[in-house]
């Protein structure tokens, strides 16, 4: 999302739905591997990377930390932690047989940065928006560019008043 526009549509995702979607992603990726390591783009990629790594039997999990959002506002990209030298070596220096996992590709800005680090890696996301979709190799669900996905780790349970009491 741009820094000046709030999303037009909301797409809340429950833990159950997210787990199902991650398993579906794993099923698709099972035909693509084998992978020597999984690289999670943090923080959003941590949960799907853990599920995918478990399903594919991958033991080596690394992270790359690129900050691009502050709550709903997009900010300048900052690499806070790069991929370890050991993981890069496992991928032959170019990312071959490495699997990069994130929750979502939005504009593709984060994916471009990581692709620059390991260009031959396989990129997988659970959700993809049209602007970022060309940068990923495998995804499960496409959502429109004007949709904000509310992931389960970003939500809290709250009381919802009955409709008869004026709830919208």
Curated annotation (Swiss-Prot):
Amino acids binding guanine: 106, 149
The coenzyme or cofactor needed here is:
Mg(2+)
UniProtKB keywords: Cell inner membrane, Cell membrane, Glycosyltransferase, Magnesium, Membrane, Metal-binding, Purine salvage, Transferase
Gene3D superfamilies from the xrefs?
A: 3.40.50.2020
Residues involved in xanthine binding: 106, 149
Instruction: Look up the domain of life of the source.
Output: Bacteria
- For the ligand (GMP), the binding residues are 106-110, 148-149
Annotated residues that bind Mg(2+) are located at 103
Q: How does it sit in the membrane?
A: Peripheral membrane protein
Q: What is its EC number?
A: 2.4.2.-, 2.4.2.22
Q: In which pathway does it act?
A: Purine metabolism; GMP biosynthesis via salvage pathway; GMP from guanine: step 1/1; Purine metabolism; XMP biosynthesis via salvage pathway; XMP from xanthine: step 1/1
The reaction(s) annotated as catalysed by this protein in its Swiss-Prot or TrEMBL entry are: GMP + diphosphate = guanine + 5-phospho-alpha-D-ribose 1-diphosphate; XMP + diphosphate = xanthine + 5-phospho-alpha-D-ribose 1-diphosphate; IMP + diphosphate = hypoxanthine + 5-phospho-alpha-D-ribose 1-diphosphate
The family database entries (CDD domains) matched by this protein are listed as: PRTases_typeI (cd06223)
**What is a GO molecular function of this protein?**
guanine phosphoribosyltransferase activity
Give the enzyme's main class according to its UniProt record, as a single word: transferase
Record's keyword annotation contains Magnesium: yes
Single Gene Ontology BP term?
Answer: GMP salvage
Q: Where in the cell is it found?
A: Cell inner membrane
Q: Where does 5-phospho-alpha-D-ribose 1-diphosphate bind?
A: 43-44, 102-110
Q: Name one GO cellular component term.
A: plasma membrane
HAMAP family hit by this protein: XGPRT (MF_01903)
Assembly description: Homotetramer.
Q: What does this protein do?
A: Purine salvage pathway enzyme that catalyzes the transfer of the ribosyl-5-phosphate group from 5-phospho-alpha-D-ribose 1-diphosphate (PRPP) to the N9 position of the 6-oxopurines guanine and xanthine to form the corresponding ribonucleotides GMP (guanosine 5'-monophosphate) and XMP (xanthosine 5'-monophosphate), with the release of PPi. To a lesser extent, also acts on hypoxanthine.
* Family to which this protein belongs: Belongs to the purine/pyrimidine phosphoribosyltransferase family. XGPT subfamily.
PANTHER family (UniProt xref): XANTHINE PHOSPHORIBOSYLTRANSFERASE, XANTHINE-GUANINE PHOSPHORIBOSYLTRANSFERASE
List the protein's name.
Xanthine-guanine phosphoribosyltransferase
Species assigned in the record? Nitrobacter winogradskyi (strain ATCC 25391 / DSM 10237 / CIP 104748 / NCIMB 11846 / Nb-255)
């Amino acid at each position: 999302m741009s820094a000046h526009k709030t999303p037009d549509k909301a797409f809340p995702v429950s833990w159950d739905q997210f787990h199902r979607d991650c398993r579906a992603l794993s099923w698709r990726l099972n035909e693509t591997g084998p992978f020597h390591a999984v690289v999670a783009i943090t923080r959003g990629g941590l949960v799907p990377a853990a599920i995918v790594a478990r399903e594919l039997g991958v033991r080596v999990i690394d992270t790359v930390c690129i900050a691009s959002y502050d709550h709903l506002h997009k900010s300048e990209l900052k690499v806070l932690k790069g991929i370890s030298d050991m993981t890069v070596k496992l991928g032959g220096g170019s990312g071959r047989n490495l699997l990069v996992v994130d929750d979502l590709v939005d504009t593709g800005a984060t994916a471009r940065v990581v692709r620059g680090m390991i260009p031959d890696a396989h990129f997988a996301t659970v959700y993809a928006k049209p602007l970022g979709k060309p940068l990923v190799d495998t995804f499960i669900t496409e959502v429109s560019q004007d949709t904000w996905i509310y992931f389960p780790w970003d939500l809290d349970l709250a009381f919802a008043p009955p409709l008869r009491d004026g709830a919208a």
